[in-house]
């Protein structure tokens, strides 16, 4: 009897004693703690958005006037004017289907502390939004016309040079997209921290400066980007000309049952594509 009591005592005093752990009362929190929402790129930054009603078939053609075409020339007295006309280009946007399927057994639905199907659908909605940001970075902003290569940290000169690339092509810089490493660099630039230089204390109070040289600063999550290397990238854009989004099917949820498998299920899909509109309206800043 004494040996048995000693064995139980040892279990209660060790981290690996399963029996001891079971004797300790535990409260299981009945509210599911959600994952934090990521910083995503809003649709308002797209120059054009084509919804399902704008795309009668499987794709849509976008027509553009080629910049700086059609010249005015000197014409001599009595001479014939030279024929010229604007040039045009066109590209096609064909939405790609993305989707995820959810299957929950009836036993899991009955025994779970929360509605697993409903929560899974809600989480899927977030993943679709994150996928859209990834597409914007890779297929929209990723097809930039010019780039600035900086050093280990972004500098003011990098930002202003990127702005100049847009100015040189007659675009108006409106937005600065920054990865998290670049955001950290901005926090360490005195010009954006000291109130007597920047005119406010936003960076000190909130750790974020919403406007730099008239650019609307938007940070994007590394975990929503195509890869972690995007954390060291920034993009200066003219939001009126940078990229377009075509969405043939909005995020669509189809609920159904699988009686043979005794499951509740949902199929969630979206048809969407992102493409640059004017490459020279985008300048990428690369840091190491």
Where are the predicted features?
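Assembly/oligomerization interface modules of large self-assembling protein complexes
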Residues: 25-98
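A generic local secondary-structure boundary/capping motif
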Residues: 90-92, 163-167, 254-255
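Alpha-helical scaffold segments that mediate packing/assembly in large oligomeric complexes
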Residues: 103-171, 284-288
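Short, structured patches in soluble enzyme cores that scaffold and shape functional sites
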Residues: 104-106, 180, 270
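Extended, solvent-exposed, turn-rich assembly/linker loops in the middle of proteins
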Residues: 141-209
């Amino acid at each position: 009897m004494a040996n048995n009591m000693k064995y139980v005592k040892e279990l209660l005093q060790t981290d690996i004693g399963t029996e001891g752990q079971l004797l300790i009362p535990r409260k299981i929190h009945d509210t599911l703690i959600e994952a934090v929402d990521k910083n995503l790129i809003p649709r308002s930054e797209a120059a054009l958005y084509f919804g399902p009603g704008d795309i009668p078939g499987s794709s849509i053609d976008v027509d553009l006037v080629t910049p700086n075409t059609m010249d005015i020339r000197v014409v001599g007295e009595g001479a014939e004017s030279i024929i010229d006309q604007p040039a045009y280009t066109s590209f096609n946007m064909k939405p790609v289907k993305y989707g995820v399927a959810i299957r929950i057994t009836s036993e899991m639905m009955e025994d779970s502390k929360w509605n697993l199907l409903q929560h899974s659908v809600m989480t899927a909605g977030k993943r679709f939004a994150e996928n859209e940001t990834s597409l914007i970075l890779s297929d929209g902003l990723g097809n930039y016309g010019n780039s600035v290569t900086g050093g280990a940290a972004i500098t003011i000169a990098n930002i202003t040079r990127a702005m100049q690339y847009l100015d040189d092509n007659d675009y108006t810089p409106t937005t600065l997209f920054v990865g998290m490493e670049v955001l950290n660099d901005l926090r360490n630039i005195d010009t954006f921290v000291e109130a007597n230089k920047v005119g406010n204390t936003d960076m000190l109070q909130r750790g974020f400066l919403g406007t730099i040289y008239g650019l609307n600063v938007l940070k994007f999550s590394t975990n929503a980007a195509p890869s972690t290397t995007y954390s060291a990238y920034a993009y200066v854009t003219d939001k009126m000309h940078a990229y377009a989004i075509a969405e043939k099917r909005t995020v669509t949820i189809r609920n159904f049952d699988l009686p043979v498998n005794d499951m509740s299920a949902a199929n969630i899909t979206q048809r969407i594509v992102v493409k640059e509109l004017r490459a020279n309206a985008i300048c990428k800043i690369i840091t190491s």
